[in-house]
Each structure stands twice: as C-alpha cells, then as structure tokens.
Amino acid sequence: AFILPYKDGDNLITDEAARIISTIPIPSLVKIIRPIPPASVFQSADNLKYLSTIILYIAIRDRDFMDCQYLYMVNRPYNRISNINRFHHKLSPEGENVLALEITCHFNDNTWKNSDDELFEKSIVHLESDQIINRDEVKKFFSVRIKNAYPFYCLGYRENLAEILGHLEQTPNLTLIGRTGAFKYMDIDQCMEDTAGMIKRFKNEGTI
C-alpha cells in the first residue's frame, strides 16, 4: 500500500491507498516519492520542462464576435482566441460573451510577470486592428495562470523521460496519466481516450 501524508489545515493526516494515479508534473512526483530515487532520476526530472499559459478572459456584451469556436493567431501576444458562447451559452454570465486569449510563456518570464492590465493593453490593440472587438465594449477582464500547462519537448526529452519511467515502473500500481502527469502533448479528446483506456486496463486486471 501507499502511505499518503497530507495536511488538512494545521492537522497532518496519514492515509493509505492501494493505487496511485498521478496527474501532477513528473518533476514534482519524483521529489515526493519514497524511497528516494537515484540522482540520475532527479537530474532527468530537472531536465523536463513545461510551458506555462496565461488565459486572459475579456467579457463583452452578448454578441457573436467570430463565426467559429476558436481561432489560432500568429504575430500576436496570444496564440489562440476562444469564443466562449460558441461552446455553450451558459459558460458566460447572462447577457455577456467572453473572449479567452491564450498566452503561452515560461514560468516567471517577462510575460508571466505582466499584470492583467499590461496583458490587456498589449492585446486590445490587435483585437481592435483585427476588427474582433473594440475597447469601449469591454466590461471587465481577468486572468487565470497555469504554471505547468504543456510539456515542452526539448532535445533529449525522450532520454530523460525514459530514465524516469524506467525507475517509476518498478513501483506497482503507480500510474502516470494526462498531459502533465505523463508528459504527453495531447488534446482534450486524447486525454479522455487515454483515461478510458486506463480504466479498461484496470477492469481487465480485476483491480477495480
């Protein structure tokens, strides 16, 4: 069994589990598992990098500002614009629509350190020039910042990943899954398919 210590407020609680399904970044997992992995595994984990993402949400009145759900952009501060009401009208407050601007960066770089106001000012210039929205129709804006959003495939990542997985596979009932947990660049449908496959394997093994 796995021993799982965690905090609930000021209280330290210890629990047990027969299986661990990890979706946290692999470097974080390597740092907390016991017994402590070899130094080579720690080094490989340090070599795995993730891209960060800032999602800048801009609320406007309820109008369809694009004839699609999302649009990829080049030479802009953001690389994708999503039209939230095109996904489902209940995802936005009543009477509003929301643009979601996806801004890719590295954790703690200059872009990450930009305030929401700075990101908005850099973006609204292009949104106006591209005739997507106008500044005067913006009701509010805010951001959500995701530190480890995408695996960053640097040269040598396969060798580093193989070193880590070779060690972790020695631990029975420890499963790594998801874009972050398995260091796989997957779309949401692939993540769901991967999870369904995991559940099917567990059922075939008779472990769930």
List each model region and its residues.
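C-terminal catalytic lobe of FAD-dependent flavoproteins
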Residues: 120-208
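Mid-domain catalytic core of redox enzymes
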Residues: 1-117, 122-131, 144, 162-170
